[in-house]
């Protein structure tokens, strides 16, 4: 017995509130775009962003978000709106300063994305071309600041399915074994 394939399930998980202004969850379809070290674009639903030493908005693994959003020094608060617009209030100012927009894409077949590790994916022939857009438009989900998306796996349901599969395998194995024994006895006659 060997694994033939594994599939990715990109249905939305529940949102858990973190109260961290740099955490964002996608409510609906879509992926955040990030700049990969090789210069290509990667895609993720993991919105646990942080600010690196250069002030860039980066993923938890240190990859900068596409569109090069930089948080100025002295920022007292960051706001990420439902449509992906990022703004900051810098010390000494009362008006928010626009910093850019989070880039998002969707795919005709997101199950065809190529996994590259650390919750990152690359486009492939199976996924189709990325369809970029503004969060909340053209079928893309909107953004919720201060939330992260939790797993979409129901552990209990998956455990029950695994046990059912194991039982079915055992029954088929017994049936084959019994059939083999019957053929052996028949050939002895």
Regions found by a protein language model. Name each.
Residues 1-189:
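Amphipathic alpha-helical polymerization modules
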